C-alpha cells in the first residue's frame, strides 16, 4: 500500500474515532440541556452514588424542571416540574409507564416477575388488575379497615409496653396489615419469622441495587464478560438474593394452599387469586410473586413514613400540642380514633401530608422508561430515555411560601381530601408525590392512606413523644438511610402515655382486637 494512501486511511480512522468520541456520551442540540458531558461516559462521573436526589435538585435549580443527563450513550431525563409531571408523565402514561431494563434486577434477581421492575405489558396489566380488585377504595373500607384499626391499637400498645424498640413497631404494624390482607397470616410481634426474612431480603436487594454496587453492565454490556470476582461476585450475590426472594414467597404461598386444602378459605387476596386461577391461569412463579410483591410494598413504606413523622413530632412539640387539642375535642380518652373521625381531625391529615412532603419514602420515583420518542416543550426525549421524577426537588421547592426544610403541617390547610383526589386533579393543587405518578402510582394508595391516618391519630391520641437520651439527627443526609427507601436512622424516643384513662383504653381495645380480629388469622 502506498504510504500516502495508508496515511489517508489512518487519518480517516482517527477522524471517525474523534467524531464518535464527541457524539457518544454527548446530548444533541434538540435535547433538554444539562451538565457538561465528557466523551464516552457523558455525565456518569458526576452522578453521586448516594443521596442522588440532593444533586439532582441542585441541577434542577441550574438547568430547570426538565434536564437531560447522558449516561454513557443512554439518556436520562430528570423532571422536577409539577406541570410536566401532569402534562407529560400522567397524560401520556401509555408511553411513560415502561421500566428501564436492569440485568441485575430483571435477569438475575426477579426474572421479570416483580411488579416494581416489571416491564409494561400484559403481565403487568394482569397483576395491576388483580391488585386493584382487592385494594380498591370500597373494598378497603368494607373489608380491610377493621384490620388496620386493630393493628393500629397494637402499634400503640407496643410503644407503651416496649418503648425501647420503637423503631421496630411500625415495621411490625405495616407488615402485619399487609400479610393479614394478602395471606391471612399476621405478624404478632416484632420477632415474626416472615417479617425478619422479608426485611433481610429487602436490605440485601437494596444494597446490591445501590449505584456503584455492581458494574454498569446495562450501559456497557461487554462488562458482563469480565470475571465477576472483579466486582465482589455480584452475579452470585444477585442470584442468591433471587433464590431468597422466591423461597420466601413460595413458602408463604404454600401455607395459604395448605390452609385451603384443610377447608379454610379466608377470602384473602391470595384466596381470591387462587379462586380465579381457572380464568387467570397464572404460572406458579407468578402466583408466588404477586403476593410477595404486595407483602414487600406494604411492609416498608407506611412504616418508614410513620418513623419519620414520629421523629418530626419529637422535634416539633407545638405540632403535638395542636394535634392533642384537636383529638381531645373530638375523641376524648375513653376510645381511640377510628377511620370515621377523619373529617373531624383535619390537622392529623395535614401532619401526614407534611410527613410525605418532608421525608418522602422515595425521593426519586423508581425510574420510568420512554416507549417512543416524545417532544416536551420543544425538546426531544428519544425512545428508551430513562425518566426520573425528582420528588424531593418538587417537595423542597424554595418558591413555596413556607420554609421547605421545616415541618409545617399548616401548609396543607387547604388540602382536606385524601391523596388520590389530588393525584387525579390539577397539578397546581397536588398535595405531594409520595405515591408516585402516572399508571405506576402505588396500587395500595387507599390502604396506605388509612394505615397512616389510624397509626398517627392513635399514636398522638395516646402519647406525648419526648426526646430520649441521645441526639436526634433529622438531617436529610446524615440522619437518613438511602437505599431503595428513604428511612430515618435510629433515634431516641420517649413515648409518655397522656393519662391513666388512655392507658386503660389501650389495654381494653387491644383485648377486643385480639378476640374479634386477630383470632381470625394464623401467625407467622
From Swiss-Prot:
Patulin was originally used as an antibiotic and specifically trialed to be used against the common cold, but it is no longer used for that purpose since it has been shown to induce immunological, neurological and gastrointestinal effects. Genotoxic effects of patulin with dose-dependent increase in DNA strand breaks in brain, liver and kidneys have been detected in mice. However, more recently, it has been proposed that patulin might also have anti-tumor properties. Pathway: Mycotoxin biosynthesis; patulin biosynthesis. Residues 24-524 are lumenal. It is an enzyme of class 1 (oxidoreductase). It is a single-pass membrane protein. Its EC number is 1.-.-.-. GO terms for molecular function: heme binding; iron ion binding; monooxygenase activity; oxidoreductase activity, acting on paired donors, with incorporation or reduction of molecular oxygen. Glycans are attached at residues 191, 499. One of its GO terms (biological process) is patulin biosynthetic process. Heme binds at residue 442. The keyword Transferase does not apply. Residues 1-4 are cytoplasmic. Cytochrome P450 monooxygenase; part of the gene cluster that mediates the biosynthesis of patulin, an acetate-derived tetraketide mycotoxin produced by several fungal species that shows antimicrobial properties against several bacteria. PatH catalyzes the conversion of m-cresol into m-hydroxybenzyl alcohol. The pathway begins with the synthesis of 6-methylsalicylic acid by the polyketide synthase (PKS) patK via condensation of acetate and malonate units. This is Cytochrome P450 monooxygenase patH. The lineage of its organism: Eukaryota, Fungi, Dikarya, Ascomycota, Pezizomycotina.
Amino acid at each position: 500500500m502506498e504510504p500516502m494512501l495508508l496515511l489517508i486511511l489512518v487519518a480517516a480512522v482517527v477522524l471517525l474515532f474523534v467524531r464518535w468520541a464527541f457524539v457518544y456520551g454527548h446530548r444533541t442540540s434538540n435535547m433538554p440541556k444539562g451538565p457538561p458531558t465528557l466523551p464516552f461516559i457523558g455525565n456518569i462521573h458526576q452522578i453521586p452514588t448516594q443521596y442522588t436526589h440532593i444533586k439532582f435538585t441542585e441541577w434542577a435549580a441550574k438547568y430547570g424542571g426538565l434536564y437531560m443527563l447522558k449516561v454513557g450513550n443512554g439518556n436520562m431525563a430528570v423532571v422536577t416540574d409539577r406541570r410536566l409531571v401532569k402534562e407529560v408523565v400522567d397524560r401520556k402514561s401509555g408511553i411513560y409507564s415502561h421500566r428501564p431494563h436492569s440485568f441485575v434486577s430483571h435477569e438475575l434477581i426477579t426474572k421479570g416477575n416483580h411488579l416494581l421492575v416489571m416491564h409494561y405489558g400484559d403481565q403487568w396489566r394482569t397483576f395491576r388488575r388483580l391488585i386493584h380488585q382487592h385494594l380498591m377504595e370500597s373494598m378497603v373500607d368494607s373489608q380491610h379497615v377493621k384490620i388496620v384499626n386493630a393493628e393500629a391499637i397494637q402499634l400503640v400498645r407496643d410503644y407503651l409496653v416496649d418503648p425501647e424498640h420503637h423503631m421496630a413497631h411500625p415495621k411490625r404494624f405495616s407488615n402485619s396489615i399487609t400479610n393479614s390482607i394478602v395471606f391471612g397470616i399476621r405478624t404478632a410481634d416484632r420477632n415474626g419469622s416472615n417479617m425478619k426474612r422479608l426485611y433481610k431480603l429487602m436490605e440485601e436487594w437494596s444494597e446490591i441495587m445501590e449505584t456503584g454496587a455492581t458494574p454498569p453492565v446495562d450501559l456497557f454490556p461487554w462488562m458482563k464478560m469480565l470475571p465477576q470476582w472483579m466486582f465482589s461476585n455480584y452475579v452470585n450475590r444477585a442470584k442468591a438474593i433471587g433464590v431468597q426472594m422466591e423461597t420466601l414467597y413460595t413458602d408463604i404461598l404454600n401455607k395459604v394452599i395448605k390452609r385451603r386444602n384443610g377447608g379454610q378459605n379466608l377470602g384473602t387476596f391470595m384466596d381470591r387469586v387462587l379462586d380465579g386461577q381457572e380464568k387467570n391461569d397464572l404460572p406458579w412463579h407468578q402466583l408466588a410473586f404477586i403476593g410477595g410483591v404486595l407483602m414487600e410494598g406494604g411492609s416498608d413504606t407506611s412504616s418508614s413514613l410513620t418513623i419519620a413523622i414520629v421523629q418530626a413530632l419529637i422535634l416539633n412539640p407545638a405540632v403535638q400540642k395542636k394535634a392533642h387539642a384537636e383529638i381531645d375535642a373530638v375523641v376524648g380518652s375513653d376510645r381511640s380514633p377510628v377511620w370515621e373521625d377523619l373529617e373531624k381531625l383535619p390537622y392529623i391529615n395535614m401532619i401526614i401530608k407534611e410527613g410525605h412532603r418532608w421525608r418522602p419514602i422515595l425521593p426519586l420515583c423508581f425510574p420510568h422508561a420512554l416507549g417512543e420518542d416524545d417532544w416536551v416543550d420543544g425538546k426531544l426525549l428519544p425512545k428508551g430515555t430513562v425518566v426520573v421524577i425528582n420528588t424531593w426537588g418538587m417537595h423542597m421547592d424554595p418558591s413555596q411560601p413556607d420554609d421547605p426544610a421545616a415541618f409545617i403541617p399548616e401548609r396543607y390547610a387547604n388540602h382536606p381530601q385524601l391523596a388520590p383526589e389530588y393525584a387525579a386533579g390539577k397539578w397546581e393543587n397536588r398535595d405531594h408525590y409520595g405515591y408516585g405518578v402516572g399508571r405506576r402510582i402505588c396500587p395500595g394508595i387507599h390502604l396506605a392512606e388509612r394505615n397512616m391516618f389510624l397509626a398517627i391519630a392513635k399514636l398522638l391520641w395516646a402519647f406525648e413523644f419526648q426526646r430520649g437520651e441521645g441526639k436526634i439527627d433529622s438531617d436529610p443526609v446524615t440522619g437518613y438511610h438511602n437505599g431503595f427507601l428513604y428511612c430515618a436512622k435510629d433515634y431516641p424516643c420517649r413515648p409518655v402515655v397522656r393519662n391513666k384513662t388512655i392507658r386503660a383504653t389501650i389495654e381494653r381495645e387491644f383485648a377486643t382486637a385480639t378476640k374479634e380480629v386477630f383470632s381470625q388469622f394464623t401467625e407467622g
